């Protein structure tokens, strides 16, 4: 008898055989372990993501939700509240000139990856986490140097804890809640600093964003900033890890992008399809829905398995092949529908620059271990350690 528990460590380790069974045999599947339905086909996931009136995010969109977050953030709200938040936050993003970030991101990449020259073996997570937090601090405007409230590693550690769940219970434990509370306290202090002395950074723009006389209130600014730090560290950091994992696994693709860095743009998109770090998100039904012969009831939770939709052969031919020439339009690596990720432009730019600079120092590498330990999170997927050997 087939079973699929999205909170299982076995699913973290290798979800793709489960996804194939789901798509082929159980496209609308009730998981008794998770007490929710699972949608696994690309078309169904896209349709659900667009139909917010039926598939609501207001009860929380993370597979294990944080207290007080549901219904209050961009990812965990529905229109019209979502549209208002998105408009104000997008206004802040538009004021932060993306081109102005390119030079500092490249300087960060050179600073982080340069010391790898001459290394024989290293954990990519060590350098990718440094890069991610430094880029996030530059983009958001988190205080650094003499202004720093805490060290970068503390910010990263708390952000990563926020998205994890207990490896045994698969629920948020006291340490995860404590990390969330710490992050809110930290974000509140930064917001106060930027309101007192605004700068050209995202937190200043969030604090002061105004559209037709409407502004974000204090709680909205706090939760938006807290969520962006969490999502920025884990989404960008997780994707950096998965991209390195793919390039270390597929020699031909790695050699191609090292020889011609212009191919990195397409390789990034294929990695977002093939092995996105954003695997599964949650919705709640606002009415009964019958799909593939199954009736899901109003109030039921539904898991949208983005990672499965990206491997759906109904959408992408030969989906289990990593092909950097594929150009996978419409992939779900950054979500979709009204909740598509707002930070995609910064993420794409940062990853492209990171690997341009990384490959100048370490052009040839492979994974040391075949079997990896994976982060205990039913929402995001990335290795806890990624040891690479230089060839």
Where are these regions (language model features)?
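Cytochrome P450
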Residues: 1-391
């Amino acid at each position: 008898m087939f079973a699929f528990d999205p909170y299982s460590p076995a699913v973290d380790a290798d979800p793709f055989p489960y996804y194939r069974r789901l798509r082929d045999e159980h496209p609308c599947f009730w998981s008794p372990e998770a007490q929710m339905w699972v949608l696994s086909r690309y078309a169904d996931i896209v349709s659900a993501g667009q139909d917010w009136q039926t598939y609501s995010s207001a009860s929380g969109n993370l597979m294990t939700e944080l207290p007080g977050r549901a219904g209050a953030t961009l990812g965990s709200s529905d229109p019209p509240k979502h549209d208002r938040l998105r408009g104000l936050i997008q206004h802040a993003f538009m004021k932060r000139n993306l081109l102005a970030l390119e030079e500092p991101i490249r300087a960060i990449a050179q600073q982080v990856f340069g010391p790898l020259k001459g290394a024989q073996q290293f954990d990519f997570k060590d350098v990718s986490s440094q890069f991610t937090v430094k880029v996030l601090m530059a983009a958001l405007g988190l205080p650094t140097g003499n202004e720093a409230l805490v060290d970068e590693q503390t910010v990263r550690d708390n952000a990563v804890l926020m998205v994890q769940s207990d490896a045994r219970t698969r629920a948020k434990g006291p340490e995860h809640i404590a990390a969330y509370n710490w992050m809110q306290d930290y974000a509140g202090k930064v917001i106060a600093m930027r309101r007192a002395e605004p700068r050209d950074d995202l937190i200043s723009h969030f604090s002061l964003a105004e559209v037709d006389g409407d502004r974000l209130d204090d709680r909205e600014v706090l939760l938006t900033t807290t969520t962006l730090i969490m999502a920025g560290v884990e989404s960008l950091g997780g994707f950096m890890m998965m991209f390195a994992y793919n390039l270390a696994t597929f020699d031909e693709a790695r050699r191609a992008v090292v020889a011609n860095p212009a191919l990195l743009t397409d390789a990034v998109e294929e990695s977002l399809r093939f092995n996105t770090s954003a695997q599964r998100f949650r919705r709640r039904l606002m009415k009964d829905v019958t799909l593939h012969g199954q009736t899901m009831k109003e109030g039921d939770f539904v898991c949208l398995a983005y990672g499965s939709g990206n491997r759906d052969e109904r959408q992408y031919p030969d989906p289990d092949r990593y092909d950097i020439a594929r150009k996978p339009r419409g992939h779900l690596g950054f979500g979709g529908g009204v909740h598509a990720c707002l930070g995609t432009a910064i993420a794409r730019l940062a990853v492209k620059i990171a690997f341009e600079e990384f490959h100048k120092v370490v052009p040839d590498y492979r994974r040391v271990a075949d079997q990896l330990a994976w982060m205990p999170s039913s929402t995001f997927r990335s290795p806890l350690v990624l040891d690479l050997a230089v060839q």
